[in-house]
Amino acid sequence: MTTPVRIGVQIQPQHSPEYSHMRDALRRAEDMGVDVAFNWDHFFPLYGDPDGAHYECWTMLGAWAEQTSRIEIGALVTCNSYRNPELLADMARTVDNISDGRLILGIGSGWKEKDYDEYGYDFGTAGSRLDDLAAALPRIRARLGKLNPAPTREIPILIGGQGEKKTLKLVAQHAHIWHGFVDPESYAHKSAVLAEHCAAVGRDPSEIQHSAGVELNGGVSRGEGVKELVAKADELHAAGITLFTVGVNGPDYDLSVAEELCRWRDSIA
């Protein structure tokens, strides 16, 4: 069965002192037909003023679950280091129930050193953080199976990252969705590596939805940028990617590129 194309928007919780701007962006995204609304799990802005306005991820997801009725929601992605695995499972189960089964549990090993230092977490090394994620994922899944009440569905796990030895192995073992930032050439290679990891664990690679972050080329006119973006989406879709996510930044949260992607999605349906 062919997986339908879906469009995501990452409503980045930065540079918007008033939460109402994010609430409005979420409303507009759902109204225009966006399929998934993501935020991210950081404590400070990733670009612009490093000490600018910023909000916490999972508290916001609870509010999103109440505000929306159709769109799926999640973090792109949760940092595994910031919460005990059992607690994260309970948080995910709770937001899943509040939203009537619309949560995607996006997770990764973490990378932003300032977040770790300012909030008192051990940054470790890239390898140790991936090892921690490998240890956490079975605990998360086990706790999801014990909670009362249970999740409303098997909560889809999205794993972000492209490392061939560890990250893609974890995707093969645990994920329903794999997210990366790829061009068509590197995607073909990474997808083949993921298929090898799936074969090693006896899993059909077609069970995993492939997701990519896309963005407008700021070095050309807007019209040309949209054409380039749609052409890239066409190429990535032909290669196997079916979830396309564009990020939007506060305080304006311009959703015009997401709207173009929704039109493209509908044109190929």
Describe the function of each predicted region.
Residues M1-A269:
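Active-site-adjacent structural elements that line small-molecule/cofactor binding pockets in enzymes
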